């Protein structure tokens, strides 16, 4: 999955993107944009973030994301993951602090690819 970051045209859906510059949902979004990645913010409380249209959920996207990146608390991430694993999404990435044993067990039971021990900002090179 980390290899898919090398192709900057691959779509990354960022669940928990934020306009709050103090939150990692903002820092990660701006970092990926600055590195030339194709990223869309997912946040039902925002219309736009960093000048990009914000979507309420991943299912609203017209293109299937290559990676769904989570920067939300584990309890929220788990609820969203429960819905997403039943759809045709394969690659899930949980930022440090967004992961949980419950999420990992769910993803393992559905044979989904996931990363829960690395920061996407570190792994996404310029």
Task: Label each region the model flagged.
Residues 1-5, 117-126:
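C-terminal helix-to-coil terminal segments
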Residues 1-45, 50:
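Hydrophobic, well-ordered beta-alpha structural blocks that scaffold small-molecule cofactor pockets
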Residues 27-28, 79-84, 103-106:
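A short acidic, amphipathic alpha-helical/loop segment
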């Amino acid at each position: 999955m980390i290899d898919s970051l090398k192709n900057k045209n691959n779509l990354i859906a960022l669940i928990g993107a934020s306009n709050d510059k103090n939150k990692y949902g903002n820092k990660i979004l701006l970092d990926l944009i600055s590195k030339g990645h194709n990223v869309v913010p997912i946040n039902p409380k925002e219309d736009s973030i960093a000048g990009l249209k914000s979507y309420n959920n991943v299912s609203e996207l017209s293109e299937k994301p290559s990676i769904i990146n989570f920067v939300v608390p584990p309890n929220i991430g788990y609820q969203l993951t429960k819905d997403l694993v039943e759809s045709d999404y394969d690659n899930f990435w949980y930022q440090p602090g967004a992961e949980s044993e419950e999420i990992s067990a769910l993803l393992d039971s559905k044979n989904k690819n996931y990363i829960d021990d690395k920061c996407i900002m570190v792994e996404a090179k310029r």
